[in-house]
Amino acid sequence: GSVFQDPNSQFFSSELAGEVAFACENYGMAREEVRSRTDAAIQTFSLEHLRGRSLDVLSRGEKQRVAIASVYALRPGVYVCDEPTANLDGEGSEQLAETLKKLKAEGCTLVIAEHRLAWLSGIADRFLYLDGGRILWEKSPVEMAHMSEGERETYGLREVTQAPVPDLPRPESGAVFIRPEDVSCKRKG
């Protein structure tokens, strides 16, 4: 099954259950089988709280999990993901990693095209670098962790490990945290 970089481009329904059920219905599965697979996929990826909400109002991370659940309902053995963390924040990337770890634990094969590497820790068994449809090199997770910054930059790859995020103090309730002044925005064209 394929999971696109932008989940909106693969949605055919405006709500969760309809989206997850779509591919099963398209394959002509019996109504009860569609319902069973839809419910199982929604439960497996902890999406129950999104039932009844429009897909348009979901976060990028939630949409990505819906896209994966939609593919999961078909129970493929292989998942191909095109830059699944594109436009996800740290939390969304962590949720996606947990989702993909579930699939890996079930014995699924994951093929992930990605230049952000840190979130793949514990998921990737090997890394391949492709250029023009050809494999230029293959590395283990240990070899990737020891790749120099210069070599990584040569290939357009990001950090292999997650940079620590400082624990910043939270402002008091009602306090001004950021005060923009003299802000302007200009768009080309």
Regions found by a protein language model. Give the residues of each.
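Conserved ABC ATPase "signature" region
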Residues: 32-50
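Conserved ABC ATPase signature
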Residues: 54-58, 62
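Hydrophobic anchor residue at the start of the ABC signature
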Residues: 68
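Catalytic Walker B motif of ABC-type/P-loop ATPase nucleotide-binding domains
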Residues: 79-82
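Helix N-cap at the start of a conserved alpha-helix in ABC-type nucleotide-binding domains
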Residues: 90-91
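H-loop/switch region of ABC-family ATPase nucleotide-binding domains
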Residues: 114-115
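Conserved beta-strand-loop-alpha-helix hinge in the C-terminal portion
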Residues: 134-156
